[in-house]
Amino acid sequence: MAPPPACRSPMSPPPPPLLLLLLSLALLGARARAEPAGSAVPAQSRPCVDCHAFEFMQRALQDLRKTACSLDARTETLLLQAERRALCACWPAGH
């Protein structure tokens, strides 16, 4: 009969692959805590970035307003043309 497998004592070091895995997880965790996501822009330059973004959005809004006015005017022109054609179709050709 074979002797029972030797149990590791609670204080014995873990096997090397497990040790490497734990070490790599600890290093990754420390790195993730050291570099929080979204902090690439220094605090001093954030107001400037925000100002540029605000100006860009204002220009985009002005462009959208111009486009909306242009589309509105074009729609009105097309509706008037359609009404004129409908009215002209109602009149007899001889008059």
Swiss-Prot record:
Region forming the signal peptide: 1-34
Entry keyword set: Cytoplasm, RNA-binding, Secreted, Signal
Any Pfam family matching the protein: Neuropep_like
Biological process, per Gene Ontology: 3'-UTR-mediated mRNA stabilization; spermatogenesis
A molecular function GO annotation: mRNA 3'-UTR binding
Family membership noted in the UniProt record: Belongs to the NICOL family.
Task performed by this protein: mRNA-binding protein which interacts with a range of target mRNAs including SERPINE1, ACTA2, CCN2 and COL4A1 and may promote extracellular matrix production. Binds to the 3'-UTR of SERPINE1 mRNA and stabilizes the mRNA, possibly by competing for binding with SERBP1 and preventing SERBP1-mediated mRNA degradation. Also binds to the 3'-UTR of ACTA2. Testis-derived lumicrine factor that triggers epididymal differentiation and sperm maturation.
Matches recorded under PANTHER family: NEUROPEPTIDE-LIKE PROTEIN C4ORF48 (PTHR35451:SF1)
Protein name: NELL2-interacting cell ontogeny regulator 1
Intracellular or extracellular location(s): Secreted; Cytoplasm, Perinuclear region
Tissues where this protein is expressed: Detected in the brain (at protein level). Also expressed at low levels in the kidney, primarily in tubular epithelial cells.
Complex and partners: Interacts with NELL2; triggers epididymal differentiation. Interacts with cell surface receptor TFRC; the interaction mediates uptake of NICOL1 into fibroblasts.
Tagged with keyword Signal: yes
Cellular component terms per the entry's GO annotation: extracellular space; perinuclear region of cytoplasm
Other information: Up-regulated in the kidneys and serum of patients with diabetic nephropathy and enhances renal fibrosis so may have promise as a biomarker of renal fibrosis and as a therapeutic agent for chronic kidney disease.
Gene responsible for this protein: NICOL1
InterPro entries, per database record: NICOL (IPR028147)
GTP-binding among keywords: no
